[in-house]
Amino acid sequence: MTEEARTILENNLVGAVATTNEDGSPWVTPVHIVSDDQAVYWFSKQTTQHSLNIVRNPRVSVTLFSSNLSKGPKGVYVNGSAQVLDVVETTEIKKLLEAKIGFLPPNFNEATAYKLKIGEINRGKSTGNCWYFYS
């Protein structure tokens, strides 16, 4: 992973998760995201539309982008199959978020963590401003 891509992952707490509805239509929603070098994680209640979509079809796309336009648009795109984490894993990822921002938002108490492995960089598609990963 490039340092620029790592910086985008480290500096952005909100991204977009794209899933597929039962009728095949796309569903995109903003989520709170935290990452490490292996994966991106987000938190959602299991009753939300995107969480229900993941149970049915785990293939997702996650996008994070830099809002600092003075350096031009920069983004990270990760495609693959999401995993629903169990209670123990969710607790560990909540600790990762809490360490990053200094607290755990109260609405996260009922949230489940989801994981998408970052995987390999797609060098053919990636540019100097956008990095594409697939797992």
Feature map (PLM): residue ranges:
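Charged, gly/pro-rich active-site loop segments
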Residues: 73-135
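A generic structural signal for nonpolar/aromatic side chains embedded in well-ordered alpha-helices
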Residues: 9, 54, 96-97
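Short beta-strand segments
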Residues: 12-46, 62-65
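A short local loop/turn or secondary-structure capping micro-motif enriched for an aromatic residue
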Residues: 36-37, 49-52, 132-133
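Extreme N-terminal tail/first-helix region
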Residues: 1-15
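Helix-adjacent hinge/juxtasegments
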Residues: 50-76, 83
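Charged, amphipathic alpha-helical segments
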Residues: 1-3, 48, 99
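A short, aromatic/hydrophobic, helix- or strand-capping loop or linear motif
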Residues: 21, 64-67, 105-112
